[in-house]
Amino acid sequence: MKMTGKKIISAALLIVFAGLLFAESEDEMKKRILKNADLSGESASDLMAADDGEDKYANSKNAPKRLPSEFPRDVPYTKAGIDFCEAHYGHKIFNEEGRKRYYEASVKAAEEMTDEYSKLITLARADYYYGLSIMESFDLTSLDNMDLGDTKTTESINDRAGAYFDKAIDECNQALKIKKGSDGYSTLAQAISMNCTAKNVSYVLANGLKVRANAKKAVALDYSNGLGQFMVIAQDAYAPWPFCKLKSSRKALLRVLDDKYIRIERFDYQMIYAAIGYTFYKQKKWDKAIEWYNKILELYPQNFAARQMIKKIQDRKAGKKN
């Protein structure tokens, strides 16, 4: 079997991490990674304490609860932005020309805005979805992405996508200097999260903890921010062992789906469904996993990631290696 560069690196990383797991306890590993992480002012001890139990998801309990219709988001999606999201998740972008067409329309809509904060966040969304379209993959950390070697994420694709995620992060940081807004923090969390897929392990160790930290800020400002709520929880669903918390993260995601005070866009639903499906996948509960990935196909019948995961699960049920 021919080994690609990515698979060789992944195999080497698995060996390294396996050695570390035998050499130290879970708490010791967490402390080591927190020590090496760039937390940008976040307290490592606070993050360690918040990492146990479901209370870490209750970061927004003091935020005002209002129905989404009564509390509009600080940067509404433009029509062009929604079209880009829908085209990506609906698998309607088949080539670079189509990708650029949606991207340029989104950028044009942003440049027509007079409010600088809104303009920057809208540009960040355009850059994020451009990078995401290039990768056509799940929101997984680079470490956990090791077992998805059949995805289209080659090193060259990662580099291209990562440049757009970098751009989105810069735009969010510029916007947040103007205004501490909920959509700014949730968009930043989302961009960092996908950059953890595109970049190397050192990037994950330095920046991974910023995802939840920024998502918590988003939800503290606007409890109804569905993306923010999702990003607070998502790392526990997608993180590699021993950091994943499959049952508690799934319970928290189901709670988000049931909360009438949380605004969930159509394209946010597919992210939540995918994360719930992934928790069942990691537990080898194949039928339950397929059930949730099928929910994505009810929204987006041609969704690439859901179809890919269903095929992967069906192959594993049949005893095939993939």
Task: Label each region the model flagged.
Residues K2-S10:
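Bacterial N-terminal signal peptides that target proteins for export
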Residues K61-P72, K79, D83-A105, R125-I178, ...:
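Short coil/linker segments at helix-helix boundaries
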Residues D183, G226-L227, D259-D268, L299-I310:
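Boundary/linker segments of alpha-helical solenoid repeat arrays
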Residues T114, K179-K180, Y223, P301:
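Short coil turns that delineate tetratricopeptide repeat
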Residues A11-G19:
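Bacterial N-terminal signal peptides
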Residues E24-D115, Q314-D315, N322:
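Extreme N-terminal leader/anchor segments
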Residues D236, R266-Y278, F304-K321:
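TPR/TPR-like alpha-solenoid helical repeat scaffolds
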